[in-house]
């Protein structure tokens, strides 16, 4: 499966412009008009990155991001916002967003960020030299150890 820039924005003009922009730079993309529409097609094995509007009708971009995180998605997320909100940007990045871009944006900078996010995603999915050994060791964990490991990975304390 090829990496794709998954665009979720309720503004049709933005979706069309981003699709055209990415195509002009040879970046495959697909666009959805809402978070709900994206969720219908979402699978845990999607590759690439998610370009996500912060404020949309219905489910917001932040709500979608939180839901995908709860479902274990590791797809890098680049938030787009027409409302330059520094606290919002900081909160999104602290929660694990790959980047936060204000509208209007510089086309080349956005495409470069999307390409970096896609490269980051590909590097995490490529098996490392010790992948088999790591998998074998993880399979030895007890159910309780797996539970603790999952909570630690989400930033919870082990107490």
Residue positions per predicted region:
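The feature encodes the CheY-like receiver
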Residues: 15, 57, 81, 85
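Helix-turn-helix DNA-binding segment
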Residues: 132-159
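C-terminal output helix
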Residues: 85-87, 101-115
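Active-site beta3 strand of CheY-like receiver
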Residues: 6, 45-52
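Acidic catalytic/metal-coordinating carboxylates
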Residues: 33-34, 58-64, 84
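Two-component/phosphorelay signaling modules centered on CheY-like receiver
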Residues: 3, 11-30
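Short amphipathic alpha-helix used as the core "switch/output" element in two-component signaling
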Residues: 36, 40, 62-74, 91
């Amino acid at each position: 499966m090829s990496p794709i820039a998954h665009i979720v924005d309720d503004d049709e003009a933005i979706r069309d412009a981003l699709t055209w922009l990415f195509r002009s730079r040879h970046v495959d993309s697909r666009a959805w008009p809402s978070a709900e529409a994206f969720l219908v097609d979402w699978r845990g094995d999607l590759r690439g990155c998610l370009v996500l509007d912060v404020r949309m009708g219905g489910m917001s971009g932040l709500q979608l991001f939180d839901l995908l995180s709860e479902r274990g998605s590791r797809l890098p997320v680049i938030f787009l916002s027409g409302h330059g909100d520094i606290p919002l940007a900081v909160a999104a990045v602290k929660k694990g967003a790959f980047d936060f871009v204000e509208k209007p944006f510089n086309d080349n900078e956005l495409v470069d960020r999307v390409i970096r996010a896609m490269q980051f995603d590909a590097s995490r999915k490529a098996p490392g030299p010790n992948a088999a050994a790591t998998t074998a060791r993880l399979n030895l964990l007890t159910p309780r150890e797996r539970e603790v490991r999952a909570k630690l990975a989400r930033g919870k304390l082990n107490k």
